């Protein structure tokens, strides 16, 4: 599935470690807005989280962990 810039999405962050922050199993449905696609293979997107998690607001997320909101 391809996502567009400014599209509202839900991201599953459970078990990911991003910039030293580990997201626990409960973080399966975080609201975010797509900023841009960052890589084609494997596909990943930079997203702007609705809520900051331990100071993280913009993070890169693999496409398989993103779904439309």
Short names for language-model regions:
Residues 2-69:
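Basic/aromatic-rich interaction segments and small domains that mediate binding to polyanionic partners
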């Amino acid at each position: 599935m391809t996502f567009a810039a400014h599209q509202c999405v839900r991201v599953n962050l459970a078990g990911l470690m991003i910039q030293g922050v580990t997201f626990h199993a409960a973080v399966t449905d975080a609201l975010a807005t797509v900023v841009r696609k960052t890589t084609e293979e494997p596909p990943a997107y930079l997203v702007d989280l609705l809520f900051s998690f331990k100071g993280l607001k913009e993070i890169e997320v693999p496409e398989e962990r993103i779904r439309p909101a």
